[in-house]
């Protein structure tokens, strides 16, 4: 009760002093400090009594309340001093130096309290500072301002010391010891030398293979110009005969690879003969039958024909009945020993392997076999090169016409003639046989028509042959197979022939003159052209897109 009365009286005095006004700066400071001391004494006494009764748990709560009240009152006193100071500055511009020193001392009292309020970690030290302040305020309650200055200085020094220690404690929360350098955040404290980047050693690349000079066609032909000798002989050797029994072997000095055609079997050019028994060939055929045509596990040579073991036995039995080299040549092609050319593969596949050999063995017309064999050899660009003379072309054409219709030999001759007709200088010989070829075109099979149309296609590219190709007979023979029932390959060949003829006619308009064409010929040509135009319109709706596209382009060109 006494404490509360004292506090009330102090507050009353402060209010009265503020209302009445302060006559001088010294009186205002003394009254303000006296009021602050009185309030602080009353509050701090209350705090000390509460600490004695409550204990550690209550100390923290009373500290918090006491600090807030003291700070609030101190701030009010500071405001009063500031207003008083401004009034004094207006009234008088000069004031003693002794009076100036009082204001910072009052501020110094507030500084420890404010710092103590911010630091919550050092409660023990704060209690000591507060007890010292209470004692100093109690002793100097009735004393003059000069007597309280040393205590205030001691209090300020204590507050500054405690604040420095508290700052050190706060710093210890974040780091300890000496302050590390920035570089230690990224690497150890020990200074390490900068590492120079060294590129990885390059892997030694294999030296690039030297470019081999490509041989010309002439040099390649000379390189392969070696003689070839293939025959089936018994293992025991002796005379070159074909006994009915015995283990036969293939003997060959070299396998010649024709220019431009890759052989089905690659046999290196050994110095000695190459031996392969029929039993080994039969074993390879059985492996191929077991593993498939191109297996990875099969070690047999690649073949162009699928020959079953039964067919192989039958083929061997047929070979024992004849000594014809042409039949043995075909047998080596079927076995995959000798290279089979594309057109011979087609012929053998179409006719049948054993059927062909059987027909050749039983065929009484033995004279055409060597001729067909010579055609096969000549078409493969041997060491002497293709025979391109006039007499040779006559011989080939006569051989084609003398063979039976649609026979394999005739097909081989037609394909050979297609290769020979590439050169324009030999066309005048071939054009003399056009009427005979038209007969093959009208009566032949699909393959016979195909090879005849190939020959006509080569002839249509030459301007000198246009006169013969646009005759009534040729046009009617070309238009006849031009329908939807014909094979796609033949239709495309006929379109190509008419495209070439159309180009020659448009570039050379002098073809239609009285000296070269009669009136009847021109009428027949126009009639055939009209019929051809109607068939073109029908083929424009062909099911095959390639044929349909070619027909539409030809219509636009015409």
Curated annotation (Swiss-Prot):
Q: Where is this region: Disordered?
A: 1-34, 139-163
Q: What domain of life does the UniProt record list for this protein's source?
A: Eukaryota
Q: Which InterPro entries does the record associate with it?
A: ARM-like, ARM-rpt_dom, ARM-type_fold
Question: Ranges of Basic and acidic residues compositional bias?
Answer: 1-14, 139-156
One Pfam family in the UniProt entry? Arm_2
Q: Which keywords accompany this UniProt record?
A: Repeat
Q: Where are the ARM repeats?
A: 300-339, 422-461, 463-503, 520-558
Family affiliation: Belongs to the eutherian X-chromosome-specific Armcx family.
Query: Could you tell me what this protein is called?
Result: Armadillo repeat-containing X-linked protein 5
Q: Which organism is it from?
A: Pongo abelii
């Amino acid at each position: 009760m006494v404490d509360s009365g004292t506090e009330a009286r102090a507050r009353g005095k402060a209010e009265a002093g503020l209302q009445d006004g302060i006559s001088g700066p010294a009186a205002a400071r003394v009254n303000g400090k006296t009021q602050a001391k009185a309030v602080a004494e009353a509050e701090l006494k209350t705090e000390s009594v509460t600490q004695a009764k409550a204990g550690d748990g209550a100390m923290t709560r009373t500290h918090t309340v006491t600090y807030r009240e003291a700070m609030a009152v101190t701030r009010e006193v500071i405001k009063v001093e500031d207003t008083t100071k401004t009034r004094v500055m207006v009234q008088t511009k000069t004031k003693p130096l002794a009076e100036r020193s009082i204001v910072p001392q009052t501020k110094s009292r507030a500084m420890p309290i404010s710092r103590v309020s911010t630091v919550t970690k050092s409660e023990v030290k704060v209690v000591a500072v507060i007890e010292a302040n209470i004692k100093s305020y109690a002793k100097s309650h009735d004393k003059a301002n000069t007597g309280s200055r040393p205590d205030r200085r001691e209090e300020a020094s204590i507050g500054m010391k405690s604040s420095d220690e508290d700052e050190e404690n706060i710093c210890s929360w974040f780091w300890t010891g000496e302050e590390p350098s920035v570089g230690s955040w990224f690497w150890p404290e020990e200074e390490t030398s900068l590492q120079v980047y060294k590129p990885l050693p390059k892997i030694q690349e294999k030296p690039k293979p030297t470019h081999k000079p490509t041989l010309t066609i002439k040099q390649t032909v000379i390189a392969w110009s070696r003689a070839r000798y293939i025959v089936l002989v018994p293992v025991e050797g002796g005379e070159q005969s074909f006994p009915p029994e015995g283990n036969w072997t293939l003997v060959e000095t070299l396998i010649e690879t024709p220019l431009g055609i890759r052989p089905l079997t690659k046999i290196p050019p050994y110095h000695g003969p190459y031996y392969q028994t029929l039993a080994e060939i039969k074993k390879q055929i059985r492996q191929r039958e077991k593993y498939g045509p191109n297996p990875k596990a099969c070690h047999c040579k690649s073949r162009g024909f699928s020959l079953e073991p039964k067919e192989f036995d039958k083929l061997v039995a047929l070979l024992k009945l004849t000594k014809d080299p042409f039949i043995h040549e075909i047998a080596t092609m079927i076995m995959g020993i000798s290279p089979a050319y594309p057109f011979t593969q087609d012929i053998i596949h179409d006719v049948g392997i054993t059927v062909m050999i059987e027909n050749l063995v039983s065929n009484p017309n033995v004279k055409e076999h060597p001729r067909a064999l010579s055609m096969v050899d000549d078409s493969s660009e041997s060491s002497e090169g293709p025979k391109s003379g006039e007499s040779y072309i006559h011989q080939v054409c006569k051989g084609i016409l003398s063979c039976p219709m649609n026979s394999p030999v005739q097909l081989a001759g037609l394909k050979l003639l297609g290769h020979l007709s590439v050169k324009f200088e030999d066309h005048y010989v071939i054009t003399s046989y056009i009427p005979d070829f038209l007969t093959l075109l009208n009566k032949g099979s699909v393959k016979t028509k195909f090879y005849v149309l190939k020959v006509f296609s080569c002839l249509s590219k030459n301007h000198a042959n246009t006169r013969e190709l646009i005759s009534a007979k040729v046009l009617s023979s070309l238009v006849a197979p031009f329908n939807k029932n014909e094979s796609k390959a033949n239709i495309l060949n006929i379109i190509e022939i008419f495209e070439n003829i159309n180009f020659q006619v448009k570039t050379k308009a002098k073809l239609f003159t009285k000296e070269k064409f009669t009136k009847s010929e021109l009428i027949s040509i126009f009639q055939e052209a009209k019929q051809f135009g109607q068939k073109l319109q029908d083929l424009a709706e062909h099911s095959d897109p390639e044929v349909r596209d070619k027909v539409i382009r030809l219509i636009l060109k015409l």
